[in-house]
Amino acid sequence: MQIAQFYTDAFFSDCEKLGIKRPEIVVPATSCIDTFIHMVEVLLEKGYAYIAGGNVYFDTSKLENYYVFGNMEEESLAVGVRDSVEEDENKRSKSDFVLWFTKSKFDDQELKWDSPWGVGYPGWHIECSGISIKYLGEYLDIHCGGIDNAFPHHTNEIAQSEAYLGHPWCKYWFHVLHLLDARGKMSKSKGDFLTVSLLEEKGYAPLVYRMFCLQSHYRKPLTFSFESLDNTATAYKKLVSRIAALKNEGEHDEAAMEPLRASFRAALENDLNTSLALTALYDVLKAQLSDADKLALIKEFDEVLSLGLLKAAKALREEQNAQKSAVPEGMTAEEAAEIEALIAKRTEARKAKDWATADAIRDALAARHIVVKDTPQGITWSVQG
C-alpha cells in the first residue's frame, strides 16, 4: 500500500504542475471490493458469467455486439493484448475475460480478499466499472482514455457494465491518440517515455508541455521532439510577455468581446479542437479591444486551457520591476543584464573548472569596477567607485 500511495502522490503532484484539476472523488480500488464482488454475483445470476479453473469469467458470447468500437473482427484478434500474454485454457472464448481471480499466473500477488469463489482479487476491468457506478451512478456522459484502452479495456467495461445494469451505460467515448517520437509510439514497456520530472530537469516548465499537447488535436498522433518543445517554450514565453504588457484599463465593449468568445466556444464544440482554441486566444491579443477587455477574455479562455497565463504574466512583471529597481544608478537595464549574463557565464566556467575563462570574465568585470561577492543567498554584485 505504501508503493501505491507513493505513485498516487507522484501522479497528483504531476497533475498539479500540468494544470490538471484534482477530481472531487478519489478512492482506491481496495476500498470497493464489496462492490466488485456484488457485481460479479449479479453477472453470474444473470448468466453473463461462468466459473472455470477457480476464476470467474465474463461470457462475451452472450452479447450481440461485443466489439462495440468496430474495426475489430473476432478472427483477426490475437489471444491477449501483448505477445507476452499466454492463452488462458479456462476461457470458453478467447475474448472472455476474468472478473475475479482465485488462481492466476501471479503467484506473488499480495493483496487478496475473501469471496464466494475463494480467496482472490478482482479483474482489471471490473474495478473501473465498479468504482464508476458506485460513485457516479448508472449513467455516464463521457468516459475517456488512451486509444489503446479502447480494446480490450473499454470494450470489456461496456460489456460488464451494461450486462450488470441492464441498460446503456455511457453516451460518449473520448480516446486520445498516441504520443510518438522519431521511432514510433512512446511507451513505458519500450523504455522510452517522458516524465514531468525529466522535463523539469531539462529546464522545461510543465505548462509548456501542456501547451505543446494543446497545439494538436486529440484524434491525431502527436510526434514529440525537444526541438518542437523548444519552439513551444519560445511561443509560450512570447505569449506571456505580450499579456504582461497589457494594462487593466480602457473602456468595456461587450459587443466587441462576444464574437471572440463565440470563436473560442466554436473551437471547443468542434470535437474539442484545442488548436483552434489557441488560435482564438491569439486573436484576442490582435483584436481592437481595450487592454482590460483583453485581460478579461484571456482569463475566461485560460480557465479552459489552464496554461497559467495570468499568473505567469504577473510573475514576469514582478521580475521586470525587480530588475529595474536593482539597476545601479547611472547604469542602463541593458548594461545590468549584460553584467548578469557575464556573472552567470563565470559561474558555469567555475563549475566546469575552466579557470581561464572564469579569470578572464573576472578581469573584464573588474575593469568595469564591478565587485562580485559570493554570499549564502547567492552571488551579488555592485559598482565600486
PLM ranges: what are they?
Residues 185-188, 193-385:
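Structural preference for alpha-helix termini/caps and helix-kink/transition segments
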